[in-house]
Amino acid sequence: MNYIIKFLNKLNNLTVAIIILLAIALASALGTVIEQNKNTDFYLKNYPLTKPLFNFVTSDLILKFGLDHVYTSWWFIFLIILLLLSLTLCTITRQLPALKLARLWQFYTNFNTKAKFQIRFKTNSSSLTKLTYYLEEKNYKIKHFNHFVYAYKGIFGRVSPIIVHFSLVIVLIGSMLSTTQGRTQEAFIVVNQEKPVLDTYEAYVNDFKIAYNSQGLIDQFYSDLILETRQASKIQKTIYVNEPLNYSNITIYQTDWNIDNLVICIDNQNYYSIPLQFIELPNGSESKYWINRLDLFGQSVFCVVNDLTGIVYLYNQNKDLICISSLGEFITLNGHTITFNKLVASTGLQFKLDSFIPLVYLGFLLLMISTLLSYISYSQVWLVKNGSTTYIFGSTNRAKFAFIKQLTEIANQC
């Protein structure tokens, strides 16, 4: 039991809390730099032992310490729990007692206590009533006791640190639950087809389009979606990168795209849907190519497509270019007419079901509220009457010069 108490006392320390927070920030940075939730071969290929990232991050380190899934690793969750405990202990043992003390009426019945205060005045006025009236005009709460007066205002300024801690606790709990309990699914859905997702929804793709810039490079890609629930409610939206679909607790992100099939017509009679295979080029090239080998009329040809503009390249077995064709254009091969009719595309989507996002939003809302409350000054004034002289003592947690100016005005009016 003593060990637990000592451990909790260690956690109830600002320095320890900052160290834990820095450790979480470092882990989060690694989780941002290192691709998450990829297969083992990906890390072996991209983080070789011979060329470590930052001179120390290798595939062995990533796989051994769970850096391939940082946010769901046991040690990251443990750091979150430690920070939660530290914030909770600080709130209970420091912030709440400070608030309780602030709410108590604090009387100083001896003018000799003036040494306690950096802000102090004296006036020849013997009327506490007049001074009290001026304080009330400045929205102070007043408490009388014989020849002594205690006044305060801005108690909400003392509440803001507690709300900060409380909001951070909510954000951390919401983020942890979101990471461990939320569900994510990635899928490619062909245009004009639907697919069940996350056991509860059906996603249907009406259309998929790509916008190109003046240099012929991809500028943006769009998916026109219909999301249907088991309750038969539907929502439709055209999404694109950085503009997801949000419905209830599900969010759908536009992530990728693919070309699945090439529809061809031979001799204006027979239609065939030819599957295309994506080819990843070496040296990290960003260009995309889809290819298929066809045996047409005793001749092997390669159909190559690199976008949805409708341009098809035909190569022979020697990798020599035979011709370049567009969709709907007729070409002749060994006496037969061939038409490339259609490219069948699919859109790459990420579906994220998370019931705890509202909890995270609530935490950030409270954090913003606490930031506004922190600008409220908590000010206290003591009036101590001694014969024909009245002493004015003051204390504030911020805006000290404005507070001094206010007390000076009150003293001068008397």
From Swiss-Prot:
- The answer to whether keyword Metal-binding applies is no
Pfam families in alphabetical order: ResB
Q: According to its record, how does it sit in the membrane?
A: Multi-pass membrane protein
GO biological process annotation, one example = cytochrome complex assembly
Q: Report whether Flavoprotein shows up as a keyword of the record.
A: no
Which superkingdom is the protein from? Eukaryota
Show the InterPro entries listed in the entry: Cyt_c_bgen_Ccs1/CcsB/ResB, ResB-like_domain
Q: Which UniProt keywords apply?
A: Chloroplast, Cytochrome c-type biogenesis, Membrane, Plastid, Thylakoid, Transmembrane, Transmembrane helix
Q: Which residues cross the membrane?
A: 14-34, 73-93, 159-179
Q: Where is it predominantly found?
A: plastid
GO cellular component annotations of the record: chloroplast thylakoid membrane
**Where found in the cell?**
Plastid, Chloroplast thylakoid membrane
Q: Which family does it belong to?
A: Belongs to the Ccs1/CcsB family.
Q: Describe its assembly.
A: May interact with CcsA.
Against PANTHER family, the record matches this protein to: CYTOCHROME C BIOGENESIS PROTEIN CCS1, CHLOROPLASTIC
Function, please?
Required during biogenesis of c-type cytochromes (cytochrome c6 and cytochrome f) at the step of heme attachment.
Q: What is this protein called?
A: Cytochrome c biogenesis protein Ccs1
Source organism: Guillardia theta (Cryptophyte)
Gene name linked to the record: ccs1
